[in-house]
Amino acid sequence: SLGRFSLTDADIRYTYYGKSDSLQHQKFDTTNLFVEGLAVDTRLRTYKLDDIRFSTRNLAFPLDGGFYTLKVGGVDLTRSSAVIDRIRLVSPFPKMQFAYLQPHHKDWFDVSVGQVSLTDIDLPSYFSEKVLRIADVQVSDVVLQNLKNQKIPVSRHIVPMIYTGLQKAPVKLDFQRVKVKNFSVVYEELSKKGTVPGKLFFTDMNGRFTGFTNIVSRPDQYIVLDADGKLMGKGAFTATWKLPVDSLNDRFLLNARLDSFDLTALNELLLPLASVEVRSGQVREMTFSTEASSKGATVNMLFLYNDLKATLLKEKDGEPTDRKFLTSLVNRILKHDNPDKARQGGDKLRHSSVSIIRDPYHSTFNYLWQILRPPLIESVGMSKKKQDTAKEIMTFFAKVKNFFRGKKNVSGKNIPEGEGKDVLLLEFEPINN
């Protein structure tokens, strides 16, 4: 038990052994701590606290062997609430060089969070039941940036679904309300032969979680995320994502809608990564729903658009040049409108319904792209059957080509099919502490 303890305006400094057994120095600036009426009985697992106040400034914690530093501007804790300001995950290395320097060639990340506010923290239940219960969590002004550099080969490994981290967390969590305000994601990807990364970004996102917990209390229990935002800063979208609480329930659900989007905005992504330029195209409405597991998914999509035209490019003398024959061929195959205009065969809507098998060697974010890609391509004129046939033909020709050329990587080993090609990955990898 502790009757009263007070610490005011303390500067706390400490050292520890960090990367390569080097001595690291840390400090807590302007630290204040006041505790009154603390009583803990470990045998009876009871906890009593009359009052607690804690504040400190300018924290810094190294992560990932020193390749990142987690910086916190300030922490203010009262008896049942806390505010954490100016959170930043930064790397001392430039983003274009990061993956070369990181031992496992991981992706570069940069994360900033304006503020995290926690209200009605139930400290007694944490000490007595080992459950962290919080009535309200507010997160604001979040920016997540990520660069994937395909020029650097990485070892393949099976990537678990994103929600398994919460399911297996060492602490039981039960948050009644979680809201995220003004969240932006900027994803960049540099192709094997590219010089400029392609960019995909989501801005002005707001989200609300209900049932945010990893405590299983009933069958078929889900965390529900309702979100809205803008694709490429232009297309307004809404989405509902249901994530399983129970690790034995290998099933998630996702429904989304996108309204009024200019497809030429995707050229920031497509030009650097796929040498494809959307010349014109306007989305009137896109809706999709998917039921998925860690093994595969089924998806239904309605993609309504007008005047879709594209150009296939190749680099010549350092400049992108129209591959006129292939461009003409592609635009003959493409359905320029959905529904087709009257002269193209009537106004019948084209719906797409397909099933896919997940490639488990990529992240959950990439898996969503795996789910969306087949129905999108089917909607603009190429059925899933034709896509699979084309893939088989390309694989066959790749095998023949590799057989006669003896295609090898830098280590002298044969490259498996699909490994030596530029492919659009669209994925986030987690940062390991």
Segments and roles (model prediction):
Residues 3, 133-135, 250-252, 295-297:
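Outer-envelope beta-barrel architecture signal
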Residues 127-129:
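Short, T/G/N/S-enriched strand-turn elements that build extracellular solenoid repeat scaffolds
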Residues 1-80, 123, 146-149, 158-252:
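Elongated, acidic membrane-bridging lipid-handling scaffolds
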